[in-house]
C-alpha cells in the first residue's frame, strides 16, 4: 500500500487510533457515523497489510530519561547495514535513513552503561562508521505519540479521548510487565488474547489493564507511513534558538499540526523538531513561514529517505514514490 494514499474513512480510522489506540470498533463507529462491521473490516485490512500498527508507548518522561539522539555518518553503500543493526536493538525505537545515503538517525533509550558502550566503543570500532554524534534529550515538548494527522473534527477527537490518569503510576509486578510487553507488540490485542498470552484469567487481565490505564501506563501510538496520509516528506530540523526563547519556540512548534516531535537537546543545536510535509514545496513553506518569524539563528534540514523503525516497530517501507492514487474501498 506504500504507493497509495488512504481514502477518507481509512484516514479517519488512523486518526481515531492516534487518539485512543485501544478504542473499540463500536465506539469508533459511533463517532465516525459508520457501522461497527465496516470499522472492524477496515482496521483488519489496514493491520493485515502492515499499513497500520498500534503499540504501547512508555510515558513521555520515561521515554526521555537518558535518551540520546544519534547521528551516524557511514561510508556509502553501508547505510542499510548500519541502520538495520541499530534497528535490531530493543533499546533503539526509532531509526531513519537520511537522504543522501550516508547518514543514519536514531533514538536510543538505554541505561548509561549500554548507551556508553554503543557510543564510545561499538560505533567507533565499526569500520563503515565515519563519525557518530550523540545528543542528550533535555526536555520533551511533544513526541510521536501525541501527533494527530488532523482528519477528525474537534468533537470527534474529544469523544474518542481516553480517560486521563487518575492515580500515580502503580508499582509493577511480573504480570504487569508481561502485559505491557504484549501491548508493546500489539496494543489492540483483546482481553482474551492477552489472557491467553500471559496465562492469567481474562477477568484478572481486565482489572490489571484498568489499573495500568488509571496510572497512565497505557499510552498508545498508531504507527502509519505518513505517505499514506498524503505527507511525502519527513524531515529532522536541527535548530539553534536563543536560550531565552527556547521554551517559547519549543511550545509554538509543538502545537503545529505538521510537527510530530520537538525536543530540547545538547550539542550545537539546542532544539530538534521532526515535521511531516506534503512535498518539498511544503517543507520550504514550513521553513519560511513557520520557522522564519520565530527568531531562530540557524536551521539544518535533514530529510528522511526511509523510516526503518518507528516506536519500536520495524517498517517495510521504501523510498517515497513520485505519486500515489487513493485507495478505493467500499464501506
Language-model regions, residue ranges each:
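A compositional/biophysical signature of low hydrophobicity enriched in polar/charged and small residues
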Residues: 1-331
